[in-house]
Amino acid sequence: VSGRVLDENGKPVRHSLVEIWQANAAGRYPHKNDNHDAPIDPNFTGGGRTMTDEHGRYQFLTIKPGAYPYPNHPTRWWRPPHIHMSIFGDGFMSRLVTQMFFPADPLNDVDLILQSVPDARARERMIARQVPMADMPMLNEVGFEHNIVVRGQRQTPFGV
């Protein structure tokens, strides 16, 4: 997962802390309060942190998380694969929290959290773009690009 943190004018937000946390490939978080019966992956920590560079770029090497049932809802609906992200930086007053979703996942259309964002274009800004991993061809995997805009009309939805 890679991308850039940008301001409302498309300029990089340099030296911001980007933090991620996510479920493992089976859809389970590595903490004691996750009651999903999927297996724990002992080799997966579930999160990471990095600083944006001079161009506002960030990058994480991780796995695609699995879907999981949302336990606190009467119908136990399933959350689509997603990665939680937070951004800390000098240009804004508080921690910004959002989620990154994967393209073409059928659960995106029925996810109560993603669908709580009323503007369809804003929801699209929460869905990453699939890109080749040109810098790591030996992995034979794909990457996902997700740019985060911290304010303005094209702002990434936060607080979801």
Model-derived features with residue positions:
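Beta-strand-dominated extracellular/periplasmic modules and repeats
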Residues: 1-127, 131-160
